[in-house]
Curated annotation (Swiss-Prot):
Belongs to the HAD-like hydrolase superfamily. This is Haloacid dehalogenase-like hydrolase domain-containing protein 3. It comes from the Eukaryota.
């Protein structure tokens, strides 16, 4: 039995954050006149992210949020936990950071990703990118990075923050009309 499709997750498989989040938040805060500690921002981000993920899973979709609002709230909470008091400036920082993470400049190709994609392409394997990360990685960063060269960038229904666990793979199977025991997990115990 041959493989008919290889799916790749976007975040931390093909792309990763270029520099630690605390440093990126620090740089934007400094640019807008806030004096913050990058280490504190990193710790606060991890706490805010963990709390928000627990309270509003899948970017708050079940609670009527979109990923933009979810991320803005995480950034606002991050700065509050780090002691920022200027809400107006923090909101401006949050808006800018959301935009910045929508660009390729804040993302880096994971070492080995290009080579893995090249190898799969050389073998004639069909590939798709799926992710339950928010839709920003489907936009510009994804178009500029390795998968675009190999997969003819296309949004699949599986690339949805609402699709978690196995559902994301089932959606990719449906999108490519590949039914039956054709996935690696079906042929390798």
């Amino acid at each position: 039995m041959s493989l008919r499709l290889i799916t790749w997750d976007i975040k931390d498989t093909l792309l990763r954050v270029r520099v630690p989040v605390g440093q990126q938040y620090f740089a934007e805060a400094k640019r807008q006149g806030l004096c913050m500690d990058p280490g504190s921002l990193e710790t606060s981000f991890r706490n805010a992210y963990r709390t928000h993920s627990r309270l509003f899973p899948n970017y708050g979709l079940a609670q009527g949020m979109d990923s933009r609002q979810w991320w803005l709230d995480v950034v606002l909470q991050t700065f509050r936990l780090s002691g920022a008091e200027d809400d107006e400036t923090v909101r401006s920082v949050a808006q800018q950071l959301y935009q910045d993470f929508s660009t390729a400049r804040n993302w880096a190709v994971v070492p080995g990703a290009r080579e893995a994609l090249d190898s799969c392409k050389g073998l004639g394997l069909k590939m798709a990118v799926i992710s339950n990360f928010d839709r920003r990685l489907e936009e510009q960063p994804m178009k500029d990075e390795p998968a675009a060269d190999h997969m003819g960038y296309k949004r699949y229904p599986a690339a949805s923050p609402g699709a978690g666990g196995a559902a994301v793979f089932c959606r990719s199977q449906e999108a490519r009309s590949l039914y039956g025991p054709r996935f690696l997990g079906d042929i390798v115990p």
